[in-house]
Amino acid sequence: IGQACEFDYSSSIALKTLKNLGYEVVLLNSNPITINTDKALAYKTYIEPINTQNVLKIVEQEGIEAILPTMGGQTALNIMVELHQQGHFEGALKHVKLLGAKIESILKAEDRRAFKECMLNIGLDLPKGGYAYSEEEALGVVKEVGFPCIIRSSFTLGGEGSSVAFNIEEFRDLAKFALEASPISEILIEESLLGCKEFEMEVVRDRKDNCVIVCCIENVDPMGIHTGDSITIAPALTLTDKEYQRMRDASFAVLRAVGVDTGGANVQFAIKDRRLLVIEMNPRVSRSSALASKATLFPIAKVATLLALGHTLEEIQNDITQSTTCFEPTLDYIITKIPHFDFEKFPQVDTTLGTSMKSIGEVMGIGGSFKESLMKALESDYLLKNLHAFLEQPLELEFLKKELRRPNPKRLLYAMHAFSDSLSVDEVHSLSFIDPYFLNEIKEIVQALLELKEADKQALLSDKNTLFGLKSMGLSDALIASFLGIAELEVRQAREALELHPKMYQVDLSANEFKSPTPYLYSTYAPFFPSHKAPPKSTRQKVILIGSSANKIGVGMEFDYALTHASLALKKMGLSPIIINNNPETISTDHDTSDTLYFEPITLEHVLEIVARERDHLLGVVVGFGGQTPLKIAKDLEALNIPLLGTAFKNIEIAEERDLCHQLLDSLQITYPRGLCANSKTQALECLDQLELPLILRPSFVLGGAKMRILRTKEECLDYIENYSFETSLLMDSFLEDALELDVDAICDLKSVFVCSVLEHIEPAGIHSGDSTCFIP
């Protein structure tokens, strides 16, 4: 948590940049499902544990002259600190240069005490607080600070060890936990800033002291929630120009004082009663750097790598604009990032969000307005699927107020429910501390949806202006249909009859002031900008690749790895790959991985708009490299005569639909555990009577073992069946005790099947293969 695809993205870009300059780069990484460990990228790759011993061994064996630690997240920085503490930079690493960040800078930024002293020395304001190295010292500090207070561990990532304490009983336990989480047993105890506005500045600086703000990111959620768990937007919408300029100047001062002379950094601020407070900084590329790069098309990882080598901003050319990188991006669109949580897999877990990160992925929506951007992001994470039913569901006022007070992944939806229950913006703001500007925008969306329930369906669907107004708010066909009580197809047909389609605009750094040749596109129904010309389309044969969206449990870097390689393979074949994805952390959403990138929700509506635009010379759509996400729309695509390249949907269905799979195995005379398939509660209860316990119950069309259970009693089975939706069929299998599990990977070219590998699991059957230790051969 807190360290995912974004560091594979930044390190891969760094490797590519260094290689193009003629450097021989040696990579140390222990994660095999990354692009950066591909043989083609580094001169040599060591898939070994990342520890000081291996760093020293590689430096000696390979004659290493410099180390670039700013692309590997907290792991890389902490290893540098360990090497420093062990005295190796005065010994074995004496002649090795550290690029991007000096040891002194890392210590100043990551050590809470040193950072605070550094900020006070340059006259910047910080939350009042103190440091502690033991439980006794912590109790002394909290007497001065008072409650509620925020506890932060030094040298950790993703807010590990951080928390908010509201009383002395909570404080004792949380302080002990935070001290254990810090590798140097140091914690910072600060005044609470709960409810204050939070901002992040992505900054780059070169050796000549040229500084550029790449992006100002505003957190929609107030302080008290880790930025990785917050809904964020860019550019900032509620800052005054005076506040922005103060923050900009403070960011430059922070980089100078800490000593980030050649590279990128992330600086976080809070605003409390007109006080501008510095919260922390990361002296490296971060999760927010990847988001800022995708939001602005400013290649932070590449620029930070070149700056680390001593280049200046005026010397570095931006590949996209073909001009210098020494100017600050200007956006004429809004991006919204929504974090993805997988709490439903862990029903016992507390879903309250705090200063320690809990999300495992994120999606980004791009639109011409905040409303459109927000709704596209919510749609990208499939959070609007049951919005109509959720708003119809009666909730007690006290429960609603409690959920608005409590930071949680559904708080935005509870705000929508509050507006549907006639609560005012002021009331929701006083409970949630979300800025009234955002709440007013959300309220207008809810009012538009509620009006649909009373609308004359035929009149609305034949009125182009009304439908355009709804679409420009970011409302999907499916969402409009659910509130009208009709099928999504009817809304789509109405739009087609009215010739109402979104415009495709290019993401660029200059609000279309300079020509951008990069086909990195988003759709919008926002009013047309005359200066925006339609982006060019490829005249070569094209293939659309659909991505996997947000990282989830069971959907991680491995799908981005596959998607990226598929795109590169198509390029080698002379074809034009088009990627549809909405995950800002990934390499597949980098502007040069494909010939055209659409940063869009992976839904039938958006994919069909893209297919219609790219229909000339289109060979087909590939759904096999995005995990379960593209498979959800594969059937509809095939039904609309859009060719699916690779496995046909009827064959995907045989593999995913348990009953069809059993029929195939029977025809091939292959044995499998005795099992039955149920499509309703009644059928499931009948199957239960025919099978012996224990059972393994599995839905069709799921990934990562979602909702799969091993059940050993009839009562457990009855409870599971009672709560199962039966949207897809349920397979009820006899569970094989003490069985050996194997994974076989194979590829087929219609004639031959080639077995690539056989993995043997150490754990017995019943433990998901993603959680099982395995070995080859």
Regions found by a protein language model. Name each.
Residues 92-162, 647-708:
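A conserved helix-loop-beta module that forms one wall/lid of the active-site cleft
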Residues 28, 70, 101, 129-132, ...:
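Structural motif
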Residues 1-35, 39-54, 58-64, 75, ...:
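ATP-dependent carboxylate activation and anion-phosphoryl transfer catalytic cores
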